[in-house]
Swiss-Prot record:
Stated name of the protein: Small ribosomal subunit protein bS16
Keyword Ribosomal protein: yes
GO MF annotations in UniProt: structural constituent of ribosome
GO cellular component entries: cytoplasm; small ribosomal subunit
GO biological process: translation
Gene3D superfamilies, per database record: 3.30.1320.10
SUPFAM superfamilies: Ribosomal protein S16
Gene that encodes the chain: rpsP
InterPro entries tied to this protein: Ribosomal_bS16, Ribosomal_bS16_dom_sf
Protein family: Belongs to the bacterial ribosomal protein bS16 family.
Keywords from the named record: Ribonucleoprotein, Ribosomal protein
Length: 91
Protein backbone atom coordinates (compact mmCIF):
# COMPACT_ATOMS: atom_id res chain seq x y z
CA UNK A 1 0.00 0.00 0.00
CA UNK A 2 1.51 3.29 -1.14
CA UNK A 3 0.54 6.14 1.18
CA UNK A 4 0.40 9.78 0.05
CA UNK A 5 -0.04 13.07 1.88
CA UNK A 6 -2.29 15.13 -0.37
CA UNK A 7 -5.10 17.67 -0.57
CA UNK A 8 -8.79 16.78 -0.25
CA UNK A 9 -11.05 19.45 -1.75
CA UNK A 10 -13.81 20.78 0.47
CA UNK A 11 -15.95 23.90 0.42
CA UNK A 12 -18.55 25.01 -2.08
CA UNK A 13 -18.39 25.72 -5.79
CA UNK A 14 -15.84 28.45 -6.65
CA UNK A 15 -14.81 28.63 -2.95
CA UNK A 16 -12.29 25.81 -2.47
CA UNK A 17 -10.93 24.84 0.92
CA UNK A 18 -8.59 21.91 1.36
CA UNK A 19 -7.83 19.37 4.05
CA UNK A 20 -4.34 17.91 4.08
CA UNK A 21 -4.92 14.18 4.46
CA UNK A 22 -2.98 10.94 4.50
CA UNK A 23 -4.55 8.51 2.02
CA UNK A 24 -3.88 5.37 0.04
CA UNK A 25 -2.63 6.46 -3.39
CA UNK A 26 -5.30 4.33 -5.10
CA UNK A 27 -8.25 6.08 -3.42
CA UNK A 28 -9.97 9.01 -5.23
CA UNK A 29 -9.11 12.64 -4.44
CA UNK A 30 -12.14 13.25 -2.24
CA UNK A 31 -12.59 9.62 -1.21
CA UNK A 32 -11.45 7.51 1.70
CA UNK A 33 -8.49 8.72 3.74
CA UNK A 34 -6.55 7.46 6.75
CA UNK A 35 -6.03 10.64 8.78
CA UNK A 36 -6.40 14.44 8.54
CA UNK A 37 -3.14 16.23 9.34
CA UNK A 38 -3.99 19.84 8.48
CA UNK A 39 -5.95 22.38 6.46
CA UNK A 40 -5.16 24.81 3.64
CA UNK A 41 -7.24 27.83 2.58
CA UNK A 42 -5.85 29.54 -0.55
CA UNK A 43 -8.57 32.22 -0.64
CA UNK A 44 -7.48 34.19 2.43
CA UNK A 45 -4.75 36.79 2.11
CA UNK A 46 -2.22 35.52 3.09
CA UNK A 47 -3.26 31.90 2.59
CA UNK A 48 -4.05 30.04 5.82
CA UNK A 49 -2.32 26.77 6.68
CA UNK A 50 -2.74 24.73 9.85
CA UNK A 51 -0.64 21.62 10.39
CA UNK A 52 -0.31 18.92 13.01
CA UNK A 53 3.48 18.81 12.67
CA UNK A 54 4.02 15.75 14.85
CA UNK A 55 1.59 13.69 12.80
CA UNK A 56 3.07 14.92 9.51
CA UNK A 57 6.60 14.06 10.69
CA UNK A 58 5.42 10.64 11.86
CA UNK A 59 3.89 9.86 8.45
CA UNK A 60 6.95 11.15 6.57
CA UNK A 61 9.21 8.98 8.74
CA UNK A 62 6.97 5.99 7.97
CA UNK A 63 7.41 6.52 4.22
CA UNK A 64 4.40 8.58 3.14
CA UNK A 65 5.09 10.58 -0.02
CA UNK A 66 3.72 14.17 -0.18
CA UNK A 67 2.16 15.40 -3.42
CA UNK A 68 3.93 18.29 -5.17
CA UNK A 69 1.53 20.91 -3.78
CA UNK A 70 1.67 19.51 -0.25
CA UNK A 71 5.49 19.35 -0.47
CA UNK A 72 5.52 23.08 -1.31
CA UNK A 73 3.14 23.86 1.58
CA UNK A 74 5.28 21.82 4.00
CA UNK A 75 8.45 23.52 2.73
CA UNK A 76 6.99 27.00 3.27
CA UNK A 77 6.14 26.02 6.86
CA UNK A 78 9.56 24.53 7.59
CA UNK A 79 8.39 20.93 8.03
CA UNK A 80 10.43 19.49 5.14
CA UNK A 81 13.59 21.13 6.48
CA UNK A 82 13.01 19.57 9.92
CA UNK A 83 12.34 16.20 8.27
CA UNK A 84 15.57 16.29 6.25
CA UNK A 85 17.62 17.44 9.25
CA UNK A 86 16.20 14.62 11.38
CA UNK A 87 16.69 12.07 8.62
CA UNK A 88 20.33 12.93 7.91
CA UNK A 89 21.40 13.68 11.49
CA UNK A 90 20.91 10.00 12.38
CA UNK A 91 23.76 8.94 10.09
Amino acid sequence: MSVKIRLKRMGSKKRPFYRIVVADSRSPRDGRFIETVGTYNPLTDPETVTLKEEKVMNWLNNGAQPSDTVRNILSRNGVMKKFHEAKFSKK
